[in-house]
Regions:
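Aromatic/basic-lined ligand-recognition segments
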Residues: 157-165, 173
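Long, positively charged amphipathic alpha-helical accessory segments at protein N-termini or as interdomain linkers
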Residues: 133-135, 170-276
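N-terminal lobe of the biotin/lipoate ligase/transferase fold
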Residues: 1-113
Length: 276
């Protein structure tokens, strides 16, 4: 299996100092474009991508198929949310200035069909970034949390991070949301409100039964440093892998931006199918 740190260079794109305010698909298109480049060229260095958005709700594909998904999305948009359906798995996740999105994009051999090692790399990167607080962190599905999954990350039983994965034939993008600041309960209430509208009329509970009190932010869990501190600790965690040089970027390079434009068009087409 390809290890993210086995390359001579790791690209770090960190735009957390300037949260996105427009289309939330834009940062996802950067991940998608880089993954496509990795699929074509196994010599591409791994990319670690950190970003934030001012106000958005990112949905999973199953969310988009709920009976009143279109109505729920329109309601969110009227309240000032950017909305999108992402390529990776998972379910609805709210984005805000206190939420850091962390992606790990790398080449992967076509025979590496087991997704777990890639999830583990993300888990260990976050654990290292939390320092001694990482010793308190546990992975495993948190009942009642939004966007539930086998690699939920929690401290004291409260989820602060969820991880999803997007697979291409020869590349992988592991994407995490990390509630660094803000109220986990409020984030949970936003998701619960979406499902109350989107799931009207369904008798099958094929969507997360969200209990907002099962969510928290790192700040609420006693982890200091805020967004800037978390981003800095991710960089420190990368630097701990002495065999890799870190190429740091605080804005998208032109060569990637051009590729991302094509990926964005494809993602927009997918999003036109919401509710169908």
């Amino acid at each position: 299996m390809q290890n993210a740190w086995s390359k001579n260079t790791v690209q770090l794109l960190d735009t957390t100092s300037r949260p996105y305010t427009g289309e939330v698909l834009v940062p996802f298109s950067l991940d998608e474009a880089y993954a496509r480049l990795c699929a074509k060229d196994p010599a591409m260095p791994s990319l670690v991508h950190l970003w934030r958005h001012e106000r958005a709700m990112v949905l999973g594909s199953r969310d988009a198929k709920l009976p009143h998904a279109v109505e729920a999305i329109r309601e969110l948009q009227m309240r000032g949310y950017e909305t999108a359906v992402r390529q990776s798995g998972g379910a609805a996740v709210p984005l805000a200035p206190g939420v850091v999105n962390l992606s790990l994009v790398m080449p992967a051999r076509a025979v590496d069909l087991n997704p777990e090692p890639f999830f583990v790399q993300m888990v260990e990167l976050i654990r290292a970034a939390l320092g001694t607080d990482g010793e308190r962190m546990h992975s495993g599905e948190v009942a009642g949390a939004y966007c539930p999954g086998s690699y939920d990350l929690a401290i004291d039983g409260l989820k602060f991070c969820g991880i999803a994965q997007r697979r291409l034939t020869r590349a992988v993008a592991v994407q995490a949301f990390v509630n660094v600041e803000g109220s986990g309960r409020e984030y949970g209430e936003q998701v619960s409100s979406f499902y109350r509208v989107a799931a009207q009329g369904t008798t099958v509970h094929n969507y997360p039964q969200v209990q907002p009190e099962r969510m928290a932010s790192l700040a609420e869990l006693g982890v200091s440093g805020g967004v800037s501190g978390f981003a800095a600790r991710i960089r420190e965690g990368l630097n701990a892998h002495k065999e890799s040089a870190i190429a740091v970027m605080d804005s998208c390079p032109p060569w990637l931006e051009a590729e991302a434009g094509n990926a964005l068009d494809a993602l927009k087409v997918r999003n036109l199918l919401v509710g169908s």
